[in-house]
Amino acid sequence: MLRILTLNEGTIVKKIDELGFESGIIYETIITSLDRLGKPHAATMGALFEKTSDSVLFKIKAYPLSKTGENLLLTPFGVLNVTDPELLVEAALDLCANFDYAESNSIKVPRLSRATAWIEFRVINTSKHDELIEFTCSPVYVGHLEVKPKPYTRAVFALIEAAIHASRIKPYKNMGLIDKASELCESAKKYLEIVEKVAPNSRYASLALKIKEKYL
């Protein structure tokens, strides 16, 4: 049985407001969950927030046979991690085995130790949308670290888009949507060209090479 020590709704809404989450925007995050053996798993997922003045929910979608989908159906608790863009790319490349975890504040599912902010949640509803399961999630705790701002480079944006597009190629192929898979492949290549142009011989270029080797 999971131990739940929740913040009150008003505090949660305030903290999520302070982090800058807005309704109607999909944010790229890393969701951590637990499998049936209690082993943590991390995966990149888009989260769509729905906020009112006194409540907040967010929705994520996963393939039912994906690790995250299976885990949340089995144990309906998880952590939404806000991270450095590089960590998002590593998660999209399935380099999660190298991730370090830290104890969460209210649930047994751990957060990422490198998360700059995190939202611990419970799943309150599931519904089927085409080939995906939509999980409606209710935050139970919100935490964050004090972080220093970083200068912006187009390489970060392009790298994230390339990783997201590339990671979806195989699922679309498996569903027989070859044209869509080809479209994603071409998009990923264009974004990687931006990385190579604005950040050659950098850690971003190294990650771009890993995306090429794994997906393209």
Feature-to-residue mapping (PLM):
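Basic, polyanion-binding surface patches
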Residues: M1-W118, R122-L216
